[in-house]
Amino acid sequence: MAAARNLRTALIFGGFISMVGAAFYPIYFRPLMRLEEYQKEQAVNRAGIVQEDVQPPGLKVWSDPFGRK
């Protein structure tokens, strides 16, 4: 009985970890692997936006989210 209980716990925990990984893939890992595609998409999305017009005074102006330090 103890082995069945441990297996059930491991399956539930493993399923939870898998679901978290599946949720983070399109949010974090896919943009990192397809950098150029996302840079082009952001250029299209931000075309025609003047940063100074939409940026609240006193805050840092947008920076490239794909830029490396």
Swiss-Prot record:
Q: Which residues lie on this side of the membrane: Mitochondrial intermembrane?
A: 30-69
Q: Mind telling me which residue stretches traverse the membrane in this protein?
A: 9-29
- List Phenylalanine amide occurrences by residue: 66
* InterPro entries reported in the protein's UniProt record: SMIM20
Keyword tRNA-binding among record annotations:
no
How does this chain assemble? Component of the MITRAC (mitochondrial translation regulation assembly intermediate of cytochrome c oxidase complex) complex, the core components of this complex being COA3/MITRAC12 and COX14. Interacts with COA3/MITRAC12 and COX4I1. Directly interacts with newly synthesized MT-CO1/COX1.
Designated name of the protein: Small integral membrane protein 20
| Organism classification | Eukaryota, Metazoa, Chordata, Craniata, Vertebrata
What's the gene?
A: Smim20
